[in-house]
A protein has these predicted regions:
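Hydrophobic alpha-helical segments that drive targeting, anchoring, or assembly
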Residues: 28-29, 38-40, 46, 66-68, ...
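Conserved Nudix-box catalytic region and its N-terminal flanking loop in Nudix hydrolases
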Residues: 42-83
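Acidic, metal-coordinating catalytic segment for phosphate/diphosphate chemistry
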Residues: 1-39
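Short helix-loop capping/hinge motifs at secondary-structure junctions, enriched
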Residues: 46-47, 128-133
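NUDIX/MutT-family hydrolases
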Residues: 120-123, 132-166
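Active-site segment of metal-dependent pyrophosphate-handling enzymes
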Residues: 86-130
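Class I (Rossmann-like) S-adenosyl-L-methionine-dependent methyltransferase catalytic domain
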Residues: 21-27, 99-105, 112-116, 149-152, ...
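A binding-site-centric feature that preferentially detects glycan-recognition modules on secreted/surface proteins
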Residues: 2, 72, 153-157
Length: 168
């Protein structure tokens, strides 16, 4: 079942738009999917986050843009390893949500995204407590930590994906 959990706007999209957070076990249309993220939870209920030391980033769910020819699950696994050092197989992931971004006015010159795009949200669950992990050398991330939900809510109150945290 597909269900809209929240709708909002964000300051990093330079035109009138709507961002919907959608709970769904199915992938969104592949031709509009631009990025993939993965919520990894361990047996203690903690979730692995990464810290990106760039303006506007900070603590976030590991993920990023798809590369040419890459599936959403392949991108999620690659980004997870690049940003946290944790390596999972694509088969360990399941789709549970996505974010749909729809531009409501024409995009400004130079805007690189289509008027309708999607960000896929995967989840994975570890059967044991998550081991300490760190981003590999050269990563854009400066740290990775297994955090309890209360701490995630403090650090990530502004994140569009926050309504999904309770669905892990």
């Amino acid at each position: 079942m597909t269900r809209v959990m929240a709708s909002r706007t964000v300051p990093w999209i330079p035109v009138e738009h709507r961002l919907d957070v959608i709970l769904s076990p199915d992938l969104p249309p592949a031709d509009g999917t631009t990025s993939a993220f993965v919520f990894v939870s361990d047996s203690t209920g903690r979730t692995l986050l990464t810290c990106v030391d760039r303006p506007g980033r900070g603590w976030d769910v590991p993920g990023g843009h798809l590369e040419a020819g890459e599936s959403a699950s392949e991108a999620a696994v690659r980004e997870l390893q690049e940003e946290t050092g944790l390596l999972l197989e694509p088969s360990a992931l399941s789709v549970f949500a996505w974010q749909r971004i729809e531009l409501l006015r024409p995009a400004p010159a130079g805007y690189r995204y289509a008027p309708l795009t999607y960000m896929v949200m995967f989840r994975a669950r570890l059967a044991a407590p998550g081991a300490a992990t760190a981003p590999p050398a050269g990563s854009e991330s400066t740290g990775a930590e297994w955090l309890p939900r209360a701490r995630i809510k403090e650090l990530c109150a502004h994140r569009t994906w926050l309504p999904l945290l309770e669905r892990l």
